[in-house]
UniProtKB/Swiss-Prot annotation:
It is found in: Vacuole. The keyword Signal applies. InterPro entries: FAS1_dom_sf, Mug57-like. One of its GO terms (cellular component) is vacuole. Residues 50-74 are annotated as: Disordered. The lineage of its organism: Eukaryota, Fungi, Dikarya, Ascomycota, Pezizomycotina. Residues 77-225 form the FAS1 domain. Transmembrane segments: none annotated. Residues 1-18 form the signal peptide. It comes from Neurospora crassa (strain ATCC 24698 / 74-OR23-1A / CBS 708.71 / DSM 1257 / FGSC 987). This is FAS1 domain-containing protein NCU02579. Keywords: Signal, Vacuole.
Length: 228
């Protein structure tokens, strides 16, 4: 299975989208139960309307699917796009990634190796703000910064920056090698301390290497990179 990119359409689809998937207002187990009980609607969906009292909601355009191959590595035809939905512990980030066209296409490209730094669901849920929110937007535009068509576009750009900050454009990625993420912000590297990989800057612990396939690896993180 390959990732299918999703783009924002008219606001009339917001209700259907809100019923399908709102990752930061629902638990990961709720998302998984729904993804098992119904097929993902492949129509392109816009940002959801904000829920009262909870701030703007702009989840990705479909629930991540945990239906990758049983064997995540070894086969020359298996891509990162095949395995991103396998691990339920990172399905929030997988959903964000598949909602952005360019990053999702990259994971389906055998010519572009990538190390995916995928934060745990719990790390994303514990953020002080949602991944598509930027305090600078609120400062400049107020509480309605993510309302309307312009707001949806603004949130989508912020979410893309968040996702791309977690994509390293190389694999294998040697210890100590400094490289800019796909998003092009400050250089990132990793080092091993007491047998544990840690992403720098930020000293973010790597829980494990979840998958290793022909065009890269998925590293599961206990924390989230700062995409600002």
């Amino acid at each position: 299975m390959r990732f299918t990119p999703y783009l924002v359409l008219a606001p009339t689809a917001a209700v259907a989208f809100a019923q399908l998937f709102d990752p930061l207002h629902r638990t990961a187990s709720d998302i998984q139960q729904q993804s098992q009980s119904q097929s993902v609607n492949h129509a392109q969906i816009p940002l959801a309307k904000p829920a009262v009292g909870l701030g703007p909601a702009m989840p990705p355009s479909g629930a991540p699917q945990a239906d990758g191959p049983a064997n995540a590595g070894g086969g020359s035809s298996v891509m990162l796009s095949d395995v991103m939905g396998r691990d339920k512990s990172i399905n929030l980030f997988a959903g964000f990634l598949r909602s952005i066209e360019s990053p999702s296409q990259r994971l389906d490209d055998p010519a572009r190796n990538t190390t995916v730094l995928a934060p745990l669901n719990s790390a994303i849920e514990n953020l002080p703000r949602k991944p598509w929110e930027d305090p600078r937007d609120y400062s400049a535009l107020g509480a309605n910064a993510y309302e309307g068509e312009d707001g949806q576009g603004r949130a989508q750009r912020n979410l893309r920056r968040f996702v791309e900050a977690h994509l390293i454009p190389t694999s294998p990625w040697p210890a100590g090698e400094k490289i800019k993420p796909v998003g092009g912000d400050t250089e990132v590297w990793w080092e091993e301390k007491d047998g544990v990989k840690r992403i720098q800057p930020g000293d973010i612990e790597v829980l494990n290497v979840g998958s290793s396939v022909v065009n890269g690896e998925v590293w599961i993180l206990k924390g989230v990179r700062n995409a600002s």
